[in-house]
A protein has these predicted regions:
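Non-transmembrane, interaction-prone segments in cytosolic or luminal domains
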Residues: 20, 42, 62, 71-77, ...
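Tandem CBS (Bateman) regulatory domains
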Residues: 1-11, 49-87, 99-103, 123-153
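A glycine-centered beta-loop-beta connector
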Residues: 28, 36-52, 102, 110-126
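Glycine-/small-residue-rich active-site loops that bind phosphorylated ligands and cofactors
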Residues: 13, 20, 45, 87, ...
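Short, charge-rich amphipathic segments
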Residues: 29-37, 56-58, 63
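The conserved cystathionine-beta-synthase
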Residues: 15-32, 39-40, 79-80, 88-106, ...
């Protein structure tokens, strides 16, 4: 069975709980990502998304007022806008289980934790990479417990 650890991103970008939403916004923009795990040290505390940040801005500010937006972003911490109850998985979680969680919760990523420590992240892009590799989640989940036939994986 294919485990999350085989396809997860191990070099995880994250923000600290006391970082400003401006820092989170810049990291997301620079790396073209939509969410960041929030940590204290290496312990997962929550997750912040581009939508969390966007929703924090007063509507009137979203009309091209860059200086005000920057000032506002520096005055709030990630902790004030993040999601605390994070759906996460462990490195040995079957990939098919992670895919089901992504779909069920309609989220773009799952932090991967081991003993509370953030060790990776599995994203929709990682799942697409798996699919493009030519393997099938159905084949992987149905083969559990079956022996290989004719030398085929």
């Amino acid at each position: 069975m294919i485990q999350v650890s085989r396809w997860m991103t191990k070099q995880v970008l994250a923000v600290e709980v006391n970082d400003s939403i401006g820092i989170a916004r810049r990291v997301m923009a620079k790396h073209r990502i939509n969410q960041l795990p929030v940590v204290t040290g290496d312990k997962l505390i929550g997750i912040v998304t581009d939508r969390d940040i966007r929703d924090a801005y007063p509507t009137s500010m979203l009309i091209d007022r860059a200086k005000e937006i920057d000032r506002f972003a520096e005055s709030y911490t990630v902790e004030e806008v993040m999601t605390f109850n994070v759906v996460s998985v462990q490195p040995d979680t079957p990939l098919v289980t992670a895919v089901r969680l992504l779909r069920r919760h309609r989220i773009g990523s799952l932090p991967v934790v081991k003993k509370g420590k953030l060790v990776g992240i599995i994203t929709r892009s990682d799942v697409l990479d798996f699919i493009l590799s030519g393997r099938s989640l159905k084949q992987v989940s149905h083969r559990k417990g079956q022996k290989r036939q004719s030398g085929r994986p």
